[in-house]
Amino acid sequence: MTDGLGVSVGCAVGIPCGVAVLVAVIFWYYMQRKFKKEIEDDEESMSGDGTISFTNLHSMRVPDNPEKDLPVSHVVGGSTSSDNTTTAQNVATAGQMEAQQSQPSKKPKNTYMPAYRKRLNSSLSTLQHQDEQRSPTDSSSTSLDTKNQNGRAHSTVLDQMIPVLAQDDNAAAASSEFSLTHERTSSNDNLIKNLHNHDFGSYPKRRSSGNLTGMISGNVSSASVHTRTSSVHSGKKNNENVFDTPNSQKFHEAVAPSEEDAESKGMRSYYMLKNNYDVENASQIAEEDQYENEFTNYSESKREFINSLRPKKN
């Protein structure tokens, strides 16, 4: 009974674990094959300056057939000499024939080519045909051809991935002229609108001088203005101490009082914090403090605090 129970438990646990491990190994093997295949396909595209070769891009490549220097045969007979040289077209034709003969015959692959790739191939073939039909005497076409050849010599991945479609020269010139004139007129219109509508930090209009003088005279002659004794309109020297506490003195002086009026008003009622104490009594206040009153007697509070720290006598 015990052996049967162990076998059943082992089968119930071991069989699912074995199947799971087997499935994991199979998936790992297929993934490794897939990764290896992708790495082999992307070997050429990993380098930034390398050429890109896809399975459907063989028709887009332009065969570079450099002209080979063939020996020139000179036949000299008597007083006459004839030079038998081959033309450039014959050399190019011979090179293409040799390349075709040297390459082994390949079976065409049945690969799917999307519509945009077909259209791209047709546009490239049309562009190549137009370049061949151009006259070599045209300076503009010659300069363009030389630029294209230099570009092909040092092509990058970006140059190969972005196609260049054919365009009519007349249409390109007309569109460029129209765009230039349109941009010029639109820029001028925008500049004029901005000049009219833009606020260059404008300030409000200046008030008239008559209103300002009226306002100044009214403020000066007003009797409700309360100023300090050190005001510019006061003819008497200021006797107020800046270190004293604020007082409740009320100034009812005129704008420009005379010295006699100031002397007649010599007796004024000042309110200062030191008036709450008897300054002559030194036992109550050791030193005069203008900010001390009956609620904030700092000297007395300090004395009481020090006395509280001393040991008490029993």
UniProtKB/Swiss-Prot annotation:
GO cellular component, one term: cellular bud membrane
Compartment annotation: Cell membrane; Bud membrane
Residue ranges annotated as Extracellular topological domain: 1-8
Transmembrane regions: 9-29
Membrane-topology descriptor: Single-pass type III membrane protein
GO BP, sorted A to Z: cell wall organization
Species annotation: Lachancea thermotolerans (strain ATCC 56472 / CBS 6340 / NRRL Y-8284)
Region of interest (Disordered), residue spans: 41-86, 125-151, 230-266
Annotated keywords: Cell membrane, Cell wall biogenesis/degradation, Membrane, Signal-anchor, Transmembrane, Transmembrane helix
Protein function: Plays a role in cell wall integrity. Affects the cell wall polymer composition in the growing region of the cell.
Record protein name field: Suppressor of lethality of KEX2 GAS1 double null mutant protein 1
Biased composition (Polar residues): 48-58, 240-249
Topological domains annotated Cytoplasmic: 30-314
UniProt feature, compositional bias: Low complexity: 136-146
